[in-house]
Amino acid sequence: MAQKPLPPSSDVLLGPVSGKSVLYLATADAPKEIDEALKKAATENKRVLLIFGANWCYDCHVLDHALHDGDAGKIVSEKFLLVHVDIGEGAKNGELISRYKIPLDKGVPAVAVLDANGKLLYSSGEGEFEAARKMMKKDLVVFLRRWQVESGTTR
């Protein structure tokens, strides 16, 4: 007797990934974008969320969609500035990959969280986001809440 497939869980990040086919612009100046985000983060009392990835990476698109949707999207828009850092085929933005301790051998997307002074607070050094399509929405929300700037505090 065949079993019925389980209904899709609303907690899984996997969702429609249409719309933005280009998240990582080939002409983007990632160091400049990070500097601009840090300046803005200081005035807006936010953190900077760096997403290392590439347009060919399905899970990068899944994570981006999740970061703009639901509770996670609300937290990101209120508490973070998002910067996409293009890795191309793996060699692009190598200095940033090293600076923010992103081990590409663990896969992408990879995430780093910076305070408004540019201090690295978190780096996904174990490939925690590599299989974004299997992450639970609630786990992403917990992650964002952990690293957001609390109201009434600075940087």
What are these regions (language model features)?
Residues K4-E44, G152:
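N-terminal leader/targeting and pre-domain segments
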Residues A28, F52, H65, D69-G94:
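Thiol-based oxidoreductase modules, predominantly thioredoxin-like and allied folds used
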Residues A42-T43, K74-S77, I102-G107, A116:
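Extracellular/periplasmic catalytic domains that process cell-envelope and extracellular macromolecules
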Residues E44-C57:
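Short active-site neighborhood of thiol/selenol oxidoreductases, capturing the structured segment around
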Residues V48-I51, L81-V85, A110-L114, L121-S123:
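Structural recognition of the beta-strand scaffold that forms the well-ordered cores
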Residues N55-D59, A66, I87-K92, G118-L120, ...:
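Solvent-exposed loop/turn segments at secondary-structure junctions
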Residues K106-T153:
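Non-catalytic, surface beta->alpha helical segment in thiol-disulfide oxidoreductase systems
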